[in-house]
Design a protein with these regions (language model features):
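N-terminal, positively charged nucleic-acid-binding surface of large information/translation enzymes
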Residues: 1-200
Length: 200
């Protein structure tokens, strides 16, 4: 009889900095769950890796006088060596610049498009590159110079407004099925404060 399968993933870590206590903590937690499930006889896959896209990565590469791909390539050993030093037993290490990742994303997007779950639109908002988050103007703070800053990291934010079209996911198509699922499985999103945030 085949073993029951179980999947564990870490975030795919941004390569704007070397692994640190936060990345180690998260990866150790994922590895602990993996070992526990393996000890219970399951066939477990633990996937980790690097997210090599984003403005933060491009800015960090430029700060080091490197092209983004060269910077990302230089960071891979730091992550692999850190996980080896911590005896992390991952089964796959994914890089978002790998051809296999690009192909998977293209296939996934095509399925969403074919099912009508994507639509084009424009987005405008205040963006913090460091936090990689958009904020409503009412959520921002002003620094001593009167400039709008991120409420979390206190760095300046940028108004991202362009006529550029973006693709959006029709989450509204799934609203009721998701709410029904969360009601039937109240422990699916933890802690409760995060569940309440999602369902409100």
């Amino acid at each position: 009889m085949p073993k029951e399968t179980y999947s564990v993933t870490t975030p795919i870590y941004y390569v704007n900095a070397a692994p640190h206590l936060g990345t180690a903590y998260t990866t150790i937690a994922a590895d602990t769950v993996t070992r526990y499930q393996r000890a219970n006889g399951k066939d477990v896959a633990l996937v980790t890796g690097m997210d090599e896209h984003g403005q933060k990565v491009a800015d960090t590469a430029a700060d080091h006088g490197m092209e983004p791909q060269a910077w990302c390539d230089s960071m891979e050993p730091a992550f692999r060596d850190a996980w080896e030093a911590l005896d992390i037993q991952y089964t796959d290490f994914v890089r978002t610049t790998e051809p296999r990742h690009a192909l998977t994303v293209q296939q996934f997007w095509q399925k969403l498009y074919d099912k009508g779950y994507l639509y084009k639109g424009a987005y405008e908002g205040w963006y913090c590159v460091h936090e990689e988050t958009y904020y409503a103007e009412s959520d921002l703070e002003k620094n001593e110079d009167g400039h709008l800053v991120c409420p979390d990291c206190k760095r300046p934010v940028q108004l991202m407004a362009s006529g550029e079209e973006n693709w959006f996911f029709k989450l509204s198509e799934f609203q009721q099925p998701l709410l029904d699922f969360y009601a039937a499985h109240p422990d699916f999103i933890m802690p409760e404060t995060r569940r309440n945030e999602i369902v409100s």
